[in-house]
Design a protein with these regions (language model features):
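Non-catalytic, conserved peripheral segments adjacent to functional cores
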Residues: 1-118, 141, 153-157, 161-163, ...
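Conserved metal-binding segment of the jelly-roll/cupin
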Residues: 120-134
Length: 172
């Protein structure tokens, strides 16, 4: 679904993604200011960003995937959310690719768009969604490839889906 239906009432305006605003939902991935640790004979700078992706619950292991996303049209209807209760999920654009992330706090499934928050990246930022954080599927502003790290393991797919009783839309 790309277009907003006549039933979408609540309009979320995607706010610029910041670490502070996104903290209840996970972690923002961005190149820090300043210099990292020199590696490769001084030809590269290394920045260690996050060392606990929380992917090992119930025997899980990291899975690196590539999502090739089409650009979405905005405003975009938000009527369905999903979560991964057993592990985090990471989205990193490969290149300068903006995307919108619509989220709700972990816990009970959201029932209304009023319970959601929306953020737009600057094209160079990624996010790590904390385990159990409700989120909309990837909403690429700019078409392109995204590296996705998520939990793989026994027990089937770690994905719960809910439909909002009161859907809404997100706009840039």
């Amino acid at each position: 679904m790309n277009d907003v239906s006549q039933t979408a009432a609540e309009v979320l305006v995607a706010q610029p993604l910041t670490s502070v605003a996104f903290a209840p939902y996970g972690t923002v991935i961005a190149a820090p200011a300043g210099e990292g640790r020199p590696i490769n004979g001084g030809n590269a700078q290394r920045f260690d960003l996050l060392d606990d992706l929380q992917l090992d619950a119930e025997g899980g292991r990291p899975m690196l995937a590539l999502f090739r996303a089409q650009a979405r049209r905005f405003p975009h209807e938000v009527s369905e959310m999903e979560r991964h209760a057993l592990g985090s999920q990471t989205f990193v654009p490969l290149g300068d690719r903006r995307f919108v992330i619509v989220v709700a706090r972990a816990g009970e499934a959201p029932t209304s768009a009023r319970q959601l928050a929306a953020f737009v990246t600057d094209g160079r930022q990624g996010v790590v969604l904390a385990p159990g954080t409700w989120h909309h599927a990837l909403l690429a502003v700019d078409a392109g490839d995204f590296a996705v790290i998520e939990r793989a393991g026994s027990g089937g797919v770690d994905c719960d889906v809910c439909l909002l009783r009161e859907p809404g839309s997100v706009r840039l």
